[in-house]
Curated annotation (Swiss-Prot):
It comes from the Viruses. It is found in: Host nucleus; Virion. Keywords: Host nucleus, Virion. This is Capsid protein. Self-assembles to form the virion icosahedral capsid.
Length: 387
């Protein structure tokens, strides 16, 4: 009898028991992450910004709101106090006048002069240039002239007295300074164009004058302003000058003008409490332009040295406005000037403000910021480049 072949035994699969995983829970319960959830990176310490970043932001953009107490953190002062001076003024080209000349300078109190304006034609009708002076009234910076111990302005060319530093600071310097202009005309009357260049000042006494901060001819608080009489740039061909910019007046709102440092080291300007003057020699008062021109004398030079930050360059803007004949639709170009000057001071020990000064700490990047600014020769840059 034949043997039968045995069948192989069928193996049964044994499944291992699944190990339970304990999920983490929070007080709000368990939440499973989905594909749309953000990925959380492990913390390796909280990054902090440099304590000097806000100061450098204002140096690169004068209108920056990073801080209202901007400094140049280079250790140039042991301690200092900063001020942010700003004003907005509208100027219009005078009737039957041509080109408007605007100069912005690093001067104390009145940083801008613009010629051939309606205000200049009204207040200074006898002056050839019919200038307007744009200053910072009521912002804690200014000078006074005293004759016989009494404040007097305007002065006479026969007076003898003192120019008093009313703010009582011993040293100062410009942290940054800028200007924004907007054409305030309707679309049908927005023609006109502008040219702009930056230039190195020739360091001449006659380029500086003293005038009222409020732009009038009688305000007792005065400041140093650029004096455009005799400035060669007004009649020069500026197209070939470094940094030349031009454009339409309707587009000038897109630009920002600012002064640049001329070197990597920015020394403070020293100013004395009081400087004696002799009328007609140290200060020559011009009854037509309502200003006192600095004389070519020792006192005139001392005033110039204490009232101008010579570490900064100057700005010249030549404006070709719409004609102003006084007729309907021919009333010229209305320009809104928003100008700012960020200053750093060191006050005299006997000043009440001396106790508010804080340490000027040094950041090695300060010189690099200066170099970065003065490497840019452009007289104007688009506002978006400052953001």
């Amino acid at each position: 009898m034949a043997r039968t072949k045995s069948k192989p035994r069928k193996r049964t699969t044994v499944r291992k028991a699944r190990r339970s995983v304990k999920r983490r829970t929070t007080t709000k319960g368990t939440k499973r992450k989905t594909a749309g959830d953000p990925v959380t990176k492990a913390k390796r310490g909280v990054a902090t910004s440099s304590p000097f970043a806000a100061h450098h932001a204002v140096r690169m953009n004068p209108f920056s709101g990073a801080t209202t107490q901007p400094k140049i953190p280079d250790g140039g002062f042991t301690s200092s106090l900063s001020r942010r001076l700003q004003n907005v003024v509208e100027v219009t080209n005078a009737s039957n006048e041509g080109i408007m000349h605007l100069v912005m300078a690093p001067t104390m109190g009145v940083p801008i002069c613009v010629t051939h304006t309606t205000e200049g034609a009204s207040t200074r009708s006898g002056a050839t240039l019919k200038p307007s002076y744009l200053g910072f009234l009521g912002q804690g910076v200014g000078l006074e002239t005293k004759v016989g111990g009494v404040i007097k302005w305007p002065i006479a060319n026969t007076d003898t007295g003192d120019v008093i530093n009313a703010a009582d600071f011993a040293k100062w310097r410009v942290v940054s300074q800028g200007l924004q202009i907007t054409l305030n005309n309707v679309d049908d009357e927005n023609d006109g164009w502008f040219e702009a260049v930056r230039f190195n000042w020739r360091n001449d006494n006659e380029d500086i004058c003293l005038t009222s901060l409020d732009g009038t001819d009688t305000g007792n608080v005065i400041g140093a302003a650029p004096n455009l009489n005799g400035l060669p740039l007004l009649t020069a061909n500026i197209v070939e000058m470094p940094g030349y910019k031009s454009g339409l007046l309707k587009d000038i709102k897109d630009y920002q003008f600012m002064l640049h440092p001329q070197q990597t080291r920015h020394d403070p300007v020293e100013i004395t409490k009081s400087i004696d003057f002799v009328g007609g020699t140290d200060l020559n008062y011009d009854t037509q332009s309502k200003k006192a021109n600095l004389g070519d004398s020792a006192a005139g030079t001392l005033l110039k040295q204490g009232l101008v930050d010579q570490n900064m360059d100057w700005m010249y803007i030549r404006i070709h406005p719409r004609s102003n004949t006084g007729a309907a639709g021919q009333t010229g170009s209305k320009l809104i000037c928003n100008y700012i000057q960020n200053l750093e001071f060191a006050f005299s020990p006997d000043s009440d403000l001396a106790t508010y000064m804080t340490t000027n700490r040094m950041d090695p990047k300060s010189a690099k910021i200066n170099d970065q600014l003065n490497n840019n020769q452009d007289a104007a840059n688009k506002k978006r480049e400052f953001n």
